[in-house]
Amino acid sequence: MARRRLDSELVRRGLARSREHARELIESGVVLVKGGTATKPATQVEESDAILVTEVDPSGHYVSRGAHKLIGALDRFADVVVTGRLCLDAGASTGGFTQVLLERGAARVLAVDVGYGQLAWPVRTDARVDVLERTNVRGLTAGALPFRPDLLVADLSFIPLELVLPALAGVAADTCDLVLMVKPQFEVGRAAVGDGVVREPALRASAVLG
């Protein structure tokens, strides 16, 4: 029976829009193969293997389950007000974070992602959304953006935040709030990551505290 890479199979089955999107799903821990969490895009799978992507928001309201990450953060950070703000969503993917910003009254949102064609149609077609695809966040410059954001959110994979913070700071308005998701598996270095998950509490703490 023919075997394929997991990221390619996700695209073939219509579970991901591109291999880039598939890799993001896998590294986010939302792809199950035969009931187990897959952690590597290169994992070999067969056509008969049961593959499930659990990213979809179970309520059916948000374009991705990732929206709830930002909802939780904004509910916790009560002093971060979205209404009327010029926002940048770094690593927008399907647009869960962008959707939350829109629903909370953002004036405009610039959705930035290295991939292409991932942003969900209801989000993409909102008049307040500017889409910047095929763009590595590390290469952002203020002159290339339609505005300088005063609220910046990020959910990035495959790269430590310390490598993108200089670019984000360079495009931000003089007064800007940043709400950034920290993913320890991309912060502590490959040697400290076993099966794709950082299990040591001290390492997880160091990823957050620096």
What are these regions (language model features)?
Residues 66-83:
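Conserved alpha-helix/loop element of class I SAM-dependent methyltransferases that forms part
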Residues 184-200:
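Short, glycine-/aromatic-enriched active-site segment of Class I SAM-dependent methyltransferases
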Residues 82-93:
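Conserved class I S-adenosyl-L-methionine
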Residues 93-98, 115:
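Residues at the N-terminus of the alpha-helix immediately C-terminal to the conserved SAM/SAH-binding loop
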Residues 100-108:
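Conserved S-adenosyl-L-methionine
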Residues 1-47, 86:
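A basic, amphipathic helix-loop patch mediating RNA/tRNA/ribosome contacts
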Residues 108-163:
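S-adenosyl-L-methionine
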Residues 162-179:
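A short glycine-rich, Lys/Arg-flanked "PGG" loop and its adjoining helix->strand segment in the class I
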